[in-house]
Amino acid sequence: MQLILLQKVTNLGNLGDLVDVKPGYGRNFLVPQGKAVPATESNKAEFEAKRADYEAKAQAIHADADARKAKLEGASVTIAANASTEGKLYGSVGAREIADAFTAAGLELNKSEVILGEGAFRNIGEYDVLVHLHADVETTVKVVVEAEKA
């Protein structure tokens, strides 16, 4: 299935690229999310006519991601969780808890932007977490998981 990308998509292409993808990926993800349109002649002509608008929108999104990166750079948050005396958590601290903690601290962060390479944290300690704000914008934040005070 051939598509025209309306924004940069990680591991696929940039704005305006003509890409071949599997039909399910295009039909169920890229097109409904507004990231691409089918590569018909009319869509190609319409895209070329509106190319400047799409590029301006992409620049604005990238600038917003850069501004958020500047706020998050070097940020740290502490999460208290129920833990045993050995330091093992009775549950886990995942992307949702991390995003909620940063949002509560005044730094907006979505669950989908938090990348936990090795899965949720199951022990108390200090962790570096990758935050993927845009296809080109990533930063690292510090998360401290500590035992709840009884």
UniProtKB/Swiss-Prot annotation:
For whether the record's keyword set contains RNA-binding, the answer is yes
Q: Which GO terms describe its biological process?
A: translation
Sample GO molecular function, one term: structural constituent of ribosome
Q: Under the cellular component aspect of Gene Ontology, which terms does the record hold?
A: ribonucleoprotein complex; ribosome
Would you say which domain of life the source belongs to?
Answer: Bacteria
Recite the UniProt keywords alphabetically: Ribonucleoprotein, Ribosomal protein, RNA-binding, rRNA-binding
Task: Work out whether the entry's keyword set contains Ligase.
Answer: no
Give the matching SUPFAM superfamilies: L9 N-domain-like (SSF55658), Ribosomal protein L9 C-domain (SSF55653)
What this protein is reported to do is described as: Binds to the 23S rRNA.
In the record, the note on similarity to other proteins reads: Belongs to the bacterial ribosomal protein bL9 family.
Q: What is this protein called?
A: Large ribosomal subunit protein bL9
This protein's species is Stenotrophomonas maltophilia (strain R551-3)
